[in-house]
Amino acid sequence: MIFIPTNGTTFLLLDGQPAVFSAVAQKLYALNTEAALIWCGFEEGEPASSVVDRLVASGVSPTDAATYVNQAARKWVRLGLLQVHIASFDGLATECAFTVSLGRSTWTFEFNGESVAQSVLQLFEHHEPPLESGNRLKIIEAKGLVYVFDNDRCVLTCAMDDVVPSIKAYLTEQLVSQCAPDIAFHAACLEHNAKALLISGDPGAGKTTLALYLVQHGRLACCADDIVLIRSDGTVTGVPFAPTIKSGAWRILEEFIPDLEDVPVHRRPDGKRVKYLNALAMVRNGSVYPVGGIVFLRRRSRGDAKLVPLRRLDVLKRVITGSYSPNRRMSHASLIAFKNMLTQADLFELSYSNVAEAGAAILGMYDGKS
């Protein structure tokens, strides 16, 4: 394996004391003599086996040298000081590839193994043959770990159990950072009669659970369960990841989605267990709709479901709080987009304790509407 320093990482000597500084973490790490030898070997592009030989030449036993190099590499990768170089996998052929469209961007995935590809496909309902243009991720499984390269730069190293949630988290981060001129809004997006219904709320408020209930019990189609892109004219488009279902909602949803029981379980970076439902007949990427309604969820431990109308100014504040732009600032153009989005929308807060009652309250908004 070949490791190289990450961008912004610098080796230095201070009064003879070797150290490494990370500009990203804003931390300084002191190194002992053996660690300094190991670091310099990696910095010079040597493979791990050659770094072990360098340590042995300094007087360390072969067994100890191999242990030191392995432990140092793992620790420095975890700290973000080192990254795996793609040259470590020269000679590995691409066995399968596909492209997905997310918002305004396309992502092509290349794999050296079919099993990882099938796991990652759980994130998407629609995919196409690989394209030559657009963003490209190379996903390599080796010795029980999965390495993800974006433009030949290692951006993720994780276990097989973590690869699907980790890739979704990375893609989400990239989509938000590249979404200009659109604005990313944290909400589920459903389509009814060529208009969008946005369902927003704090983490754990039940956006995905309620959205899936509405899809199964109403005439609504799912566009997205967590990311909506707001365009300059106020129309929106959902980012069509397969809905992420947390473990607390499995029992509720299995009552009307029986196949959910057989969907594989994944572990997110935050430790939560999730399933991805990619058999929902989701709206295809790029479908754009005016917003017909926005519902903000307020989950309670008890009490009947209740819809309360909201003023547009109050909703604007909430939308600003739940939105993200590449420069992390809302501009005049952003405010105009929000205003355009809210102009013709029905705006409510929904307090509820029972998903079925909440779903009935929202479906009641459409009674009498075609």
Question: Could you describe each region identified by the protein language model?
Answer:
Residues 177-192:
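Pre-Walker A adenine-sensing motif
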Residues 207:
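Conserved lysine of the Walker
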